[in-house]
Amino acid sequence: IAFYDLDWAFQTRSNCFFNLIGSEQTAQIAPTIRWLFGIDDFKERLLTRYAELTETTLSDEHVTEKIDGFRALLAPEIARERAHWGGSEEGWNEQVDALRANIADDYAAHTVRNLCDALGVGEEERMEYFGF
């Protein structure tokens, strides 16, 4: 399944959803997702790959490191950016802090549970793929 609008998806837990199969609001995505689930081993491959990603690229630790790195990279430019577009450096820092806190609070496990719920994966099968 494709990532989209990652700043929105990572910002709050309520934005972490997988309702792409039947929602009429996502009609451009739903046919593709339905087609993929028609492939015999797609669900297994999806769960296996997501398990790998939540241990590496999408792990809470890795994502918070990326947030910290981008914060350090962008911090010198924020005063100029806010002067042009409005807002304050303090407001920017508050948003970055909120994003970081959301990820640091076991976000990967939250996404795993949402994904498993959406796919009808029970606790035993979730344990096999994700270890919890």
Regions from the PLM with identified roles:
Residues 1-132:
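Middle-to-C-terminal accessory/interaction subdomains
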